[in-house]
Amino acid sequence: KTQIVFETDWLEKLKFKNHTDYDLKDNCSAIAVKSESGSVYDFYRTNPIEDPADFQYTQLYHKVKEVKEIVDYFNFLETTRVRIHKTEPQQVIDLHTDGNNDEAKTQEDYRLRIITALNENEDFIYTYEFEGEQQNILLEKGQSIIFDPDKVKHGLINNSKTETRYALVQIFKAYPVHRQLIQFINSNEIVIL
C-alpha cells in the first residue's frame, strides 16, 4: 500500500469545530479543506448527490502549504467534501453508515470515502464492519483506507489517554476509476511530500 510522508507540526495550530451530525456529535471535531460554501466550518452537503463542481477549496487549503501538498497529491480524485477530523483522547465514534449514495441512480452519482491518517498511535483504532464481520485497523501516519460509507459500517476508538487523532477525510467520485487511483491502491511505495 502507498504511504505518504509529510510534516504535521501545523496540525495543533488549527481551530476545529464540533460536528453536529448524529454519528459524530460530541466525538469528533473538524475543519474543512473543501466545502460547498468555502467556509472552513461547513462540513455538510445540501444536495443528496454531491457534485464536485459545487465544492470549493477553503482558506485552509490556500494558506497552509502542507495541507495543500497532501490534498494535491490526491489530484487524481474528483472530490466533494474534504475535511480534517480530530478525535480527542478517550473519544469513540460508534460504528455507523452514512447515506451518501441513497439517491445515486447511476455510477456517475456514486461516492466513496478515503481516510488518510495524519498521525499514528497504537491506541487509534479504526473500526469497520462489513457483512457482519468487524475489523480493527491501525493506520500508520500517511496510510489510507478506501471504503463505501453506506455499505461498510465505520467508526473509531481513541483509547489514548493523552494523544489526539487526526485524519484527512475525502469524499470522491467512484467512477470513472482513475488509473492513478488503481496505482495508489496496488503499489507498495513511500511518497515523500
What is the predicted function of each stretch?
Residues 1, 111-113, 167:
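Intrinsic-disorder/low-complexity, polar/charged segments enriched in Ser/Thr/Lys/Arg/Asp/Glu/Gln
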Residues 1-76:
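Non-heme Fe(II)/2-oxoglutarate
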Residues 3-11, 113-115, 120, 143, ...:
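General structural signal for secondary-structure boundaries
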Residues 7-9, 34-36, 109, 118, ...:
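Compositionally biased, intrinsically disordered low-complexity segments
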Residues 16-25, 40, 83, 94-96, ...:
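Intrinsically disordered, low-complexity peptide-like regions
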Residues 32-36, 46, 85-87, 119, ...:
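Structured loops at beta-to-helix junctions and adjacent beta-edge loops in soluble globular domains
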Residues 69-144:
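Catalytic core of non-heme Fe(II) oxygenases with the double-stranded beta-helix
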Residues 120-193:
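Catalytic core of Fe(II)/2-oxoglutarate
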